Amino acid sequence: GVIINVKCKISRQCLEPCKKAGMRFGKCMNGKCHCTPK
């Protein structure tokens, strides 16, 4: 995945930031969002 500079606690918090970054969805790992490219 692609790490974006968005802090998170749960994976659901990464959904919008990843969409805004032009990617599909993301999960929270080590306090940062990891997005899945389209």
Curated annotation (Swiss-Prot):
The keyword Electron transport does not apply. Changing E16K: No change in activity. 1 to 2-fold increase in activity on Kv1.1/KCNA1, Kv1.2/KCNA2 and Kv1.3/KCNA3 without affecting activity on KCa3.1/KCNMA1. Loss of activity. Loss of activity. It comes from the Eukaryota. Disulfide bonds join C8-C28, C14-C33, C18-C35. Keywords: Calcium-activated potassium channel impairing toxin, Disulfide bond, Ion channel impairing toxin, Neurotoxin, Potassium channel impairing toxin, Secreted, Toxin, Voltage-gated potassium channel impairing toxin. Has the structural arrangement of an alpha-helix connected to a beta-sheet by disulfide bonds (CSalpha/beta). Belongs to the short scorpion toxin superfamily. Potassium channel inhibitor family. Alpha-KTx 03 subfamily. Negative results: does not show activity on Kv1.4/KCNA4, Kv1.5/KCNA5, Kv1.6/KCNA6, Kv1.7/KCNA7, Kv3.1/KCNC1, Kv11.x/KCNH, KCa1.1/KCNMA1, KCa2.1/KCNN1, KCa2.2/KCNN2, and KCa2.3/KCNN3. Does not show activity on Kv3.2/KCNC2. May not inhibit neuronal human alpha-7 nAChR, since it does not inhibit alpha-7 alpha-bungarotoxin binding (IC(50)~20 uM). This is Potassium channel toxin alpha-KTx 3.7. It comes from Orthochirus scrobiculosus (Central Asian scorpion).
